[in-house]
């Protein structure tokens, strides 16, 4: 690799020229993509992955968004509706759909990584360290997978779309097509996480604030002139408005909108997502970090102290190596709990943002555009996911991939500045700066290694890759590799559904958390949500009560058939609650099927 990549400004170049960094990226990209393709079949379908395809399948059958489905993540299903419909057109049985959509995820993820590499270089080419920053950020993003689930979910799609939005805004020079692209991508991200409207509000405020103060900004120093111009706001807002109008037409035309008064509260707040006050949200934000990381309090206090010292030090440029070592130590301390105990991909991304923030403070010529257009939107995305998810720190850290990009840019820019500062000096300061650079790069390497290790040896809700030796041979999970026991269990349950599946018409309610069953059945879903909360007697009765309210609003959705798991059917209190209905009962070892008499 050309060692001059850490030095100052570089001349403009053709992005397709076969430079050393491009060749290195090509080999890294091929290696990681090959790894991802190898990993694709491993792991059976879980409730989470089942849900991602079950909701668009429901809409494909004709059910209405926001009316017939009450899951809060349902709007992201609109993005998957076209490919799901295409797949069922080509494969009417839906066989192997989960494996196919894992490959589709790899395509989206890989293309986003290439886009990231190209646009980091294009938009930061004048900055020190832009080439290794582009290579490192794209490699970390490519190896990473949200919760180690290789699926197109509202999580992975919102991350990928926000990456595209932020990088395009960072490279903006007033091009109309880029603004249209940003509007489309951001609209898709909002479908995945509606709380991202907060990001649009922050953008609108920034545009207004700049319009008020633009006369006070010296000419040539308005670095955010294109991103926060009135033109940018108008085009992006116009695109979002057009797409929002199309969504409203799709969702509400021909529907009884008055029903939304009953439905929206049930979508927003349920047993898994209870309503919280603003004070509870802030306390919960602190608590979710404190409970999940034994080092959080010392890390927080150390970070505040270090931030204050750096800000107060007017000669910080001479002491940057020392501060960088301190920041690297804080990052490692925060990462220790996750690296040694949890070993989940989600929690290993946020530490990049800690190191990146301090690197930004230490840069003499700060990359304001990357901080405002990548790092801050990434932080807003984390907060939005905290609001919408019940996963706590896992959700917050899992979507910090956007801030990770800016953080890596800041670290390599800082290293480039420090190299330029001491490259002609043979002194202790020079060797100490080299040592600090090695420490910070080691932190990045350790985190990258932790993500790679977890991705290689673990699968979501599985014990480990080594035990996944059996391929599923039938149904929607065909082609996936899991344990022999789970493969046999899936195939047994699939075969038991044959009599019910062959009855093509009617509505069916699967009172089970095995959402994949809906994709095996051509009948319409009779449930208020594809995701049903099942468990003890009280929870099951609450879920049944919710279904009854759903059937009151939509009598046409009352089930013709009800599938109840065998363990739930053994609960006499729960089964007695069905006594108000007339039905014919058929039972087997694994389930009870109620044929309802309407």
PLM feature spans:
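Short hydrophobic/aromatic helix or loop-helix immediately within or flanking a transmembrane segment
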Residues: 53-57, 68-99, 103, 189
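Short periplasmic/luminal acceptor-recognition loop of GT-C membrane glycosyltransferases, typified by
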Residues: 71, 447-534, 560-568
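Transmembrane-helix motifs of polytopic, lipid-linked glycan transferases
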Residues: 103-127, 306-311
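Short acidic/glycine- and proline-prone juxtamembrane loop motifs at membrane-interface regions
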Residues: 147-158
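Perimembrane helix-loop-helix junctions
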Residues: 4-7, 171, 186, 199-244, ...
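Membrane-interface alpha helices of multi-pass inner-membrane proteins
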Residues: 166, 178-194, 200-205, 378-389
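Membrane-lumen/periplasm interface segments of specific transmembrane helices
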Residues: 229-307
């Amino acid at each position: 690799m050309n060692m001059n990549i850490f030095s100052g400004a570089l001349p403009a170049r053709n992005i397709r020229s076969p430079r050393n960094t491009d060749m290195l990226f090509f080999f890294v990209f091929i290696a990681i993509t090959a790894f991802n393709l190898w990993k694709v079949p491993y792991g059976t379908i879980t409730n989470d992955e089942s849900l991602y395809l079950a909701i668009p399948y429901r809409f494909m059958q004709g059910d209405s968004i926001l009316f017939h489905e009450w899951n809060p993540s349902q709007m992201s299903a609109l993005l998957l509706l076209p490919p799901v419909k295409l797949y069922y057109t080509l494969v009417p049985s839906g066989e192997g759909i989960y494996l196919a959509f894992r490959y589709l995820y790899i395509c989206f993820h890989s293309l986003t990584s290439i886009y990231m590499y190209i646009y980091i270089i294009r938009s930061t080419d004048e900055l020190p360290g832009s080439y290794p920053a582009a290579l490192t950020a794209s490699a970390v993003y490519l190896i990473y997978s949200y919760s180690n689930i290789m699926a197109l979910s509202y999580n992975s799609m919102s991350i990928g779309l926000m990456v595209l939005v932020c990088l395009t805004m960072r490279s903006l020079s007033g091009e109309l097509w880029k603004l249209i692209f940003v509007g489309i991508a951001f609209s898709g991200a909002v479908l995945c996480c509606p709380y991202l409207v907060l990001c649009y509000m922050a953008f609108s405020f920034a545009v207004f604030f700049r319009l008020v103060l633009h006369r006070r900004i010296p000419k040539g120093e308005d670095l955010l002139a294109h991103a926060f111009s009135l033109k940018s706001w108008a085009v992006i807002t116009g695109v979002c408005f057009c797409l929002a109008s199309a969504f409203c037409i799709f969702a509400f035309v021909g529907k009884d909108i008055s029903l939304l008064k009953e439905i929206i509260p049930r979508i927003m707040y349920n047993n898994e997502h209870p309503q919280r006050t603003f004070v509870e949200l802030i306390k919960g934000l602190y608590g979710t970090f404190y409970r999940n990381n034994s080092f959080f309090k010392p890390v927080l206090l150390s970070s505040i102290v270090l931030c204050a010292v750096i800000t107060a030090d007017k000669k910080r440029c001479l002491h940057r190596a020392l501060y960088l070592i301190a920041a690297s130590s804080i990052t490692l301390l925060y990462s220790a709990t996750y690296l040694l105990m949890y070993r989940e991909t989600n929690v290993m991304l946020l530490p990049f943002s800690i190191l990146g923030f301090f690197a930004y403070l230490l840069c003499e010529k700060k990359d304001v555009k990357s901080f405002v257009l990548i790092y801050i939107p990434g932080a807003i995305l984390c907060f939005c996911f905290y609001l919408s998810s019940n996963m706590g720190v896992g959700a917050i850290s899992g979507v910090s991939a956007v801030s990770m990009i800016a953080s890596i840019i800041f670290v390599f820019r800082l290293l480039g500045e420090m190299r330029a500062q001491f490259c002609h000096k043979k002194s202790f300061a020079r060797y100490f700066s080299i040592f600090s650079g090695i420490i910070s790069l080691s932190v990045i390497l350790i985190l990258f290694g932790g993500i790679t290790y977890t991705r290689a040896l673990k699968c979501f809700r599985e014990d480990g890759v080594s035990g996944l030796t059996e391929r599923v041979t039938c149904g929607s999970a065909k082609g996936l590799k899991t344990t022999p026991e789970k493969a046999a269990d899936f195939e047994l349950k699939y075969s038991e559904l044959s009599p019910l599946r062959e009855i093509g018409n009617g509505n069916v309610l699967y009172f089970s958390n095995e959402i994949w069953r809906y994709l095996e059945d051509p009948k319409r879903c009779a449930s208020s949500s594809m995701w049903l909360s099942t468990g003890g007697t009280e929870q099951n009765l609450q879920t049944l009560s919710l279904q009854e309210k759903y059937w009151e609003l939509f009598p046409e959705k009352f089930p013709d058939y009800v599938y109840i798991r065998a363990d739930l059917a053994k609960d006499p209190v729960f089964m007695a609650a069905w006594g108000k209905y007339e039905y014919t009962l058929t039972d087997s070892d694994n389930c009870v099927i109620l044929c309802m008499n309407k």
